[in-house]
Amino acid sequence: MATQIDASSEAAAATAAAQHTPMMQQYLRIKSEHPDTLVFYRMGDFYELFFEDAEKAARLLDLTLTQRGASAGTPIKMAGVPHHAVEQYLAKLVKFGESAAICEQIGDPATSKGPVERKVVRVVTPGTLTDAALLSDKSDVFLLALCVGHNKRGVASNIGLAWLNLASGALRLAELAPDQLGAALERIRPAEILAADGTIESVPAGMGAITRVPAWHFDIASGTQRLCDQLEVASLDGFGAQALTSANGAAGALLIYAAATQGQQLRHVRSLKVENESEYIGLDPSTRRNLELTETLRGTESPTLYSLLDTCCTAMGSRLLRHWLHHPPRASVAAQARHQAIGALLDAPPNAGLDSLRSALRQIADVERITGRLALLSARPRDLSSLRDTFAALPALRERVAEIASNAAALGRLEAALEPPPGCLDLLTRAIAAEPAAMVRDGGVIARGYDAELDELRDISENCGQFLIDLETRERARTGISNLRVEYNKVHGFYIEVTRGQTDKVPDDYRRRQTLKNAERYITPELKTFEDKALSAQERALARERALYDGVLQALLPHIEGCQRVASGLAELDLLAAFAERARTLDWVAPEFTDEIGIEIDQGRHPVVEAQVEQFIANDCALNPERKLLLITGPNMGGKSTFMRQTALIALMAYVGSYVPAKAARFGPIDRIFTRIGAADDLAGGRSTFMVEMTEAAAILNDATPHSLVLMDEIGRGTSTFDGLALAWAIARHLLSHNRCYTLFATHYFELTQLPAEFPQAANVHLSAVEHGHGIVFLHAVEEGPANQSYGLQVAQLAGVPAPVIRAARKHLEHLEQQSAAQATPQLDLFAAPPVVDEPECNEPPAAATPHPALERLLELDPDDLKPRDALDLLYELHTLARSGPADAQR
């Protein structure tokens, strides 16, 4: 019965296929193999899309949608793009999260019976980009696979991640708890995520294009074996991945998919890195966002820490900088080695100094991505010429590094890495023309002298010019037609052109080839014989050149690992040189590390803000076991958030390996950096501003350790005054008593400044400001002790709030202050007994009136003795006395 059903189904399919033309049958077969992908079907000089693909491409790419004929009774909708411009259209599709299958003609139209043979040679997806035209120079593109592991009860117990930078061949694995997935994806920022049907729901929204793959691709045992085969090892023990489970399953699915899109092996994926959470300083999504490491809060690329630090001379260095900023190592050993290398670069002699080194680095090509294309056999001629020129420049670069490497072990390691693979430079020099064409099909790629057969064929083609000149001279003399011309075009080949008024002089052996409005074009037996010989030589030369070029690519494959080593060394050298340039230009210093708990920053500056203003006020920051929490008060716009962020950024920069913007800095161990700064709601997630604030606070309270650095800015402001005050008080107490972490706690709740009385490990500092006339001057200096007011009305006035509103607010503020003075001190500790307020005795005689100190000071001075400067100083003094009152002056 089953056999009958299968037979009838096949017959029905055959009948349906017969209704289409042979070419459409070929297209539909290819399309059935790529149902969710736009198929770019090569037809001559164009890539055509049909049916639904054509409609979608026309909409996304702004193409003209046409309709030509019908197949099986259905109108054929078409849209096409020129083959030479396909990359720019692919780039647009990738930005929309779409994928495209590139279907090329692989058969010879002259010998094909029926449609020319075609096949899909590659699939371009958001996560598998390698072509330079599709990639951003300064950021990596990651393809990530996600595999959920379950316990015996069927509950998700861990999540395995495998992500690949196909352009470089870097493969990484990690296993983590389910609640850590969002933070990991935020850090990796994959362009495309592979997941099985049952796990797609685990992926947070907006994290990249999601591609469904069969669940069996994630089999753990198969994934482990596939990894071993890819890395050409018997066991993964050497990579620390043998004990992994779900991560190996994810890696298996990743490798299957990546190889399928490229249509070949991934020869450049020869190493593996297993990421461990304890290896790096933890930075959650909120911290990365609030510190503006690589993207501002407005979503722009500048001004950020990355944009400030990125003075790299190569794209490889810029990409490595982005990776280092998001992966600061916890161990200070790596940072110290980088600091040592920066110091050696700064102290180098002029002939091998920083400027000379960076000048040489500017001539270096993107070896990392060229190597990736080499491994995938998709490198273009100018990739190879750039690689050749880079390898030719390496000996001089190595000499410069060697002269200063004795003072830094890291530079010695890099100097050794910059040796080109043996024989690689010689092959590229002999094989590739000095200035090759962009594409092999254009010819002129293989250097003369590399292949005798190619040189002979080229000689035939290149001697055409002289033959045509000689023929033209002879024919003018023979026919008496002085303006006769012998020319060539790609459509009609070689021809003799005669103007219409001279056609009566044409000899009998001239055969008409083309008629124009004002001329006739002819061919002669002699010219036809030469044409056959010349065009045949040209075609054979191009075919020979294509074969030779493919041979060069194959010959370079054994050198892939050596090229990757060179690329890695160049990227790190470039980044260290950029760090040295920043340190010299911006007056940064090398930080120190200690095993003792503490953060000490002398005259620290915010690196990004300092670059945006004319003058920046430097400030100190000291945190240690006796001073774990700083309560920061002061006016709005006074610099509280800047001070907090600069402390975190200086710490981060130190562990990344950069010098830091300070007079001196010293750091103990840091395991994580948390920030709770700013206010923003999450409308898509259904969370209010206050809910977002409390969620971030909860993460800090649950995860911060004594080695964590915590920034808390105005916690509790998203709710009512007393609720917010109570929460802020309780959170600060918990950070001191339970987490015992380094904490910078900015607040406008001045009641919190009483906290140091209960916890000696807390201290008050404030950002100072002075009133000047009807305005306010922010001093941006951090001083010990609490602030005495917030200057909110003055800031509102600076912001342009209308004067009537300011006057009304000032009047209401006076009323509130009078009310507050008449009430008891608020009960801050929710579990303490209410404070006892002593009532004044009514029968006591009133105290004698005390003259106001400002008045006394005025009576003491002689106005005629005051100089202008003294008068200004006195004005400020009187202003302070007037605000303090008699009682304060006496204290």
Curated annotation (Swiss-Prot):
InterPro entries: DNA_mismatch_repair_MutS, DNA_mismatch_repair_MutS-lik_N, DNA_mismatch_repair_MutS/MSH, DNA_mismatch_repair_MutS_C, DNA_mismatch_repair_MutS_clamp, DNA_mismatch_repair_MutS_core, DNA_mismatch_repair_MutS_N, DNA_mismatch_repair_MutS_sf. ATP binds at G634, P635, N636, M637, G638, G639, K640, S641. Belongs to the DNA mismatch repair MutS family. This protein is involved in the repair of mismatches in DNA. It is possible that it carries out the mismatch recognition step. This protein has a weak ATPase activity. One of its GO terms (biological process) is mismatch repair. SMART domains: MUTSac (SM00534), MUTSd (SM00533). GO terms for molecular function: ATP binding; ATP-dependent DNA damage sensor activity; damaged DNA binding; mismatched DNA binding. It comes from the Bacteria. GO terms for cellular component: cytosol. This is DNA mismatch repair protein MutS. Keywords: ATP-binding, DNA damage, DNA repair, DNA-binding, Nucleotide-binding.
